[in-house]
Amino acid sequence: MKVVLYMAMTVNGYIAKENGDTPWSDAVWNGYYNFVKKRGNIILGKRTYELMKDANEFEKLNFPTTVVVSNSPDKQGGDKTIFVPSPKEAVRVVKEKGFSEAIVGGGSKLNAGFLKEGLLDEIYLDIDPLLFGKGIKLFDETDTEAKLELLAANNLSKNTLRLHYKVLK
């Protein structure tokens, strides 16, 4: 099972504004929708899940199998939404559902949890030409470090770049 973190971010490393707003370009949104639709699953933190649910994002993703890592995992989500207490449990559920890749879609705390537990195999970053003065970082405060190997760098559009890294273990 390959675990892949997929995030959009600004040039200065933010994945959202402080209020959770994500004003990404069409190139980033289209890249994100296609990436998740092709794989059929996504693992989210509770806040990111709520923001996406409120914005009707799951319809645009063809209602993928969604695993939400939450401190209250007993919450019911629906046919394709499963709540779990930890990143390791999220990966187990995705694998049990028959997927070969688990897609981690944020937020910052969840990303840090996957990094800290050594679960990430690859990272895709779509870099939009934006700067946020303040915001939510790619990884919440963590003392965990990782070395990466660049596998590919491609343009999604004239101004937007996709970086693909392997996490070295």
Predicted regions and their residues:
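Enzymes that bind and transform nitrogen-containing heteroaromatic metabolites
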Residues: 1-169
